[in-house]
Design a protein with these regions (language model features):
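Basic, helix-initiating cap at the start of DNA-binding domains
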Residues: 1-29, 33-45, 58-62
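Solvent-exposed, amphipathic alpha-helical segments
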Residues: 17, 21-29, 75, 79, ...
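Key DNA-contact positions within bacterial/archaeal DNA-binding proteins
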Residues: 48
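Alpha-helical DNA-contacting segments of helix-turn-helix folds
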Residues: 54, 62-68
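Hydrophobic alpha-helical connector segments
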Residues: 63, 76-111, 161-168, 192
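Amphipathic alpha-helical segments used for helix-helix packing
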Residues: 92, 105-129, 177
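Hydrophobic/aromatic-rich alpha-helical bundle segments in the mid-to-C-terminal region
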Residues: 128-132, 136, 150-202
Length: 204
């Protein structure tokens, strides 16, 4: 008789599956409409498995938000950098602005979800450290992306990378929220123009 050995999934794999499921639930239901039980069911684990990896729903949201940001925003910046480094008739800032607009402003709900979570944080001071850590991590990722960008395209002499990353971060978030709420008031050409102005202040 053959005995089948059940392989226990790695903790990192379980965590990744939970974060992916959480991202899908939050995107569909919003922050208030999502529960830990729903995330667990979607991931195919028990609630206990979720709580062994995360303290609760706020921490789940922060992890899912960070996964979105790393993929969509930092990834979009990498794509934009690639576009700028490729042969083109467009000036570098315009090429990057076009790529950023295409990748970032796709109607994703996450910037709006972050606003929903921020409203919860305003009412629950205990969550402020979690929110601050999330935003600081995002800024650090953009600083690192800008530092890598400087190896491929020239940056303005004396540029403060943290200030530039914060400006870019604020621009991406604000434009995404406005575009999501009223696309007709924030047309693509205007978005590209705004990104171009910001990037011209960053690039040499």
């Amino acid at each position: 008789m053959t005995t089948t050995t059940r392989v226990r999934p790695l903790r990192s794999d379980v965590r990744e599956q939970i974060v992916t499921a959480a991202g899908a639930e939050f995107a569909e239901r919003g922050y208030a409409g999502t529960s830990v039980a729903q995330v667990a069911a979607r991931a195919g684990f028990t609630k206990g498995a979720v709580y062994s990896n995360f303290e609760g729903k706020p921490e789940l949201f922060a992890a899912a938000m960070q996964a979105y940001f790393a993929g969509a925003v930092v990834g979009a910046f990498a794509d934009a950098l690639g576009a700028a480094a490729s042969p083109s008739d467009q000036p570098t800032a315009q090429a990057m602005a076009h790529a950023l607009a295409e990748n970032v402003l796709l109607g994703e709900r996450w910037p709006t979800l972050l606003g929903e979570f921020r409203a919860v944080v305003a009412q629950e001071p205990a969550l402020r450290d979690l929110y601050a850590e999330l935003r600081l991590t995002q800024r650090t990722q953009l600083v690192d992306a800008l530092r890598r960008a400087g190896e491929q395209v020239p940056l303005r002499v004396g540029l403060d990378l943290e200030v530039a990353a914060t400006l870019l971060h604020t621009c991406v978030h604000g434009l995404s929220v406005e575009r999501s709420a009223a696309p007709e008031a924030m047309p693509t050409a205007l978005v590209e123009g705004l990104f171009t102005q910001v990037l011209e202040g960053i690039l040499a």
